[in-house]
Structures are given as structure tokens and as C-alpha cells.
Curated annotation (Swiss-Prot):
Belongs to the troponin I family. The lineage of its organism: Eukaryota, Metazoa, Ecdysozoa, Arthropoda, Crustacea. This is Troponin I. Troponin I is the inhibitory subunit of troponin, the thin filament regulatory complex which confers calcium-sensitivity to striated muscle actomyosin ATPase activity. The keyword Cytoplasm does not apply. Keywords: Allergen, Muscle protein. The keyword Cell division does not apply. Transmembrane segments: none annotated.
Length: 15
């Protein structure tokens, strides 16, 4: 748990 979570995905899109 905690790999491609919505929160992490948002950070990826932030770039």
C-alpha cells in the first residue's frame, strides 16, 4: 500500500 495511490499520482501529474 502506498505505491500508485491517488495522492502519489497527483504528485506525478504535478511535475
Amino acid at each position: 500500500k502506498g505505491f500508485m495511490t491517488p495522492e502519489r499520482a497527483a504528485e506525478f501529474n504535478f511535475r
